[in-house]
Swiss-Prot record:
Source domain of life: Eukaryota
InterPro entries to which the protein is assigned, alphabetical: TF_fung, Transcription_factor_dom_fun, Zn2-C6_fun-type_DNA-bd_sf, Zn2Cys6_DnaBD
The protein, known as: Abscisic acid cluster transcription factor abl7
The encoding gene: abl7
Gene Ontology BP terms: DNA-templated transcription
Binding region for DNA: 13-40
Pfam families: Fungal_trans, Zn_clus
Cellular component per GO, a single term: nucleus
Phylogenetic classification of the source organism: Eukaryota, Fungi, Dikarya, Ascomycota, Pezizomycotina
Organism, as annotated: Leptosphaeria maculans (strain JN3 / isolate v23.1.3 / race Av1-4-5-6-7-8)
Any one GO molecular-function label of the UniProt entry: DNA binding
Matches recorded under PANTHER family: C6 FINGER DOMAIN TRANSCRIPTION FACTOR DBAA-RELATED, ZN(II)2CYS6 TRANSCRIPTION FACTOR (EUROFUNG)-RELATED
Its biological purpose: Transcription factor that regulates the expression of the gene cluster that mediates the biosynthesis of abscisic acid (ABA), a phytohormone that acts antagonistically toward salicylic acid (SA), jasmonic acid (JA) and ethylene (ETH) signaling, to impede plant defense responses.
Amino acid sequence: MDTTHDRRTSLSCDECRRRKLKCDRVRPQCGTCALSESECVFPGDSRKRGPKKGQLQALRARIRTLEQQLAAKDATWNMTYDFQDSTAAEPDEFSQCIQPNVNVFEPESMETLIFGIASSTSWPKNGMTPLDPALGAESHDSHISSTLSSLSLSALVQADLEQLFFDRVYQSAPIIHKARYITLMEQEDPLPACVCLRLAIRTSAAAFSARYHDIGERLYLETLQSLESLESNEHTLPWGAKNIQIEHIQSWLLLAVYEHMRMDKSQASSATSRALRLVQRCRLGDLDASDCLIQVGSHTTTATEEDFAVMEEKRRTFWLAFCFDRLLNTRDDLNWALPEEMVGFQHGHSLFSPGHFQGASLMYDLQIRMRVPASEASFQHSQDTNMPLLSEVMGEGNDDSLSPFATCVALMALYGCCATHRRLVSIAGGSGNESTKFWMRHNWLMSAIEKQRRLLQAPESTPNIFGDDPMLAFTHFFVPTLILHLVETADLWQWHSAEQEELRSVYKQQAYIAAKDRTRVAESLLCFSGFKVHPFLPTVLVRFFDFSGKRRIEMSDPDATSESRRNIRAMTKVLSLLRDIHRSAKEIPDDVLDGLETTLL
């Protein structure tokens, strides 16, 4: 064996360095290693390390894509390769088990329709692009592209899902400007946040469809993976917190719609929490204060420089997050992630301040920062409309009618006040001074809610009071629910004068009227498509059953017994119709629903 003495380096081999011996540096094996029959490795000759982080995952994604392409071209081809990695097992299982039950397209089957993949020269230009040839590239563009490719939907299914979103989901989550969305998606290389938004739109649409119900969970996992990848890349950049795109927040909110519709209660608030954190990080609540800096599209501008459509889309995104924050806590005494102080809502009375009960006599002095959403026509047609601030909407002198979404925002703000009002009951004592403050707050809230009820009131002869608008139906149902919430709070107060007891009786009469209004809405819902019902309507219905079971305020008046029975029957029928569509409708067991109907016979 030829040996050479390497005089170019003074470094010993690894074995001699480990044993702290003098090395003669003879190649390919030094004398010490030859005697001990050890492997002689010099610095610079070390074996190359394994693949970099992300390379194996990208390789698996490419293999899955190739397998699906082969399966689409040859129906007899069988995917038999099984990854041992546990992280890849779940997506493979989903890719093999998705078999839609509906077969409405002839002669091709639904399976061929959904998983048909175009040839390499005719990939659709709407985000379904091939993987980057550079396997080790770790930019979020290539990573999200690989995510999209692992679930290959045909162009027809993609278009159908997006149309379903605007037909069924948009009315409950009106945050997308359709023309701007189409423009963003027609870009040759859309931004990662825009790609995530498109996935989230398809995922939320699947929750409102019987045809695509089977692929909803798969779409959810794909969207979640894309958003996680986007955020993991942002966290590596010190300037990432300043470049939150509005499409990023919208993606989490639409994913929250799917979670609330399909996921268990323990998982139903995950996406909403992520969206709320992003809203806080980018200070989206300061939008109308002209000091919010947020990236939109491919450039960053101040809020005053943007056109109405972009500004309105941001407002709507914030208000939807605000509504979700309130609605997720209708049954839990949790703190708000977006308190009223953030949106600039000033309570009409200093009695809402907990500090007031500690002897402080200060008024809220908040800068009004946010305007309520404009009408749908103004938003979609980009017609600049100067909407009032939330505090102006809540004012006593403002009786202007608002869009259903703006009305929903006002009701959510009122619900936050009602929840704070109830929490202060446990803080305050039972003295006469505290009782006066309690009833002052109570009267102000009841007046504000009654004003919203009057604005929404429809003629008695109207057979369908909300047409085909799920947001309008939800607001019609939520107003009487707020009245019942206040009546329940009044029932919790222990110290009452004779005058206050009389006022309390008046509120109970208002609760009876509210129950009649809610019965009317519920009976109209029976003619409403279950796939167009607001995602949080079943949650409010469940809250009604909690109220009825604990207090039975509606049933306490003998004259209201007949109306109460009609009310509960209508609620029961609506919940029964929604149990197969909305997860929250299943929170009341079947035996409880049956028992309610039996007791009212």
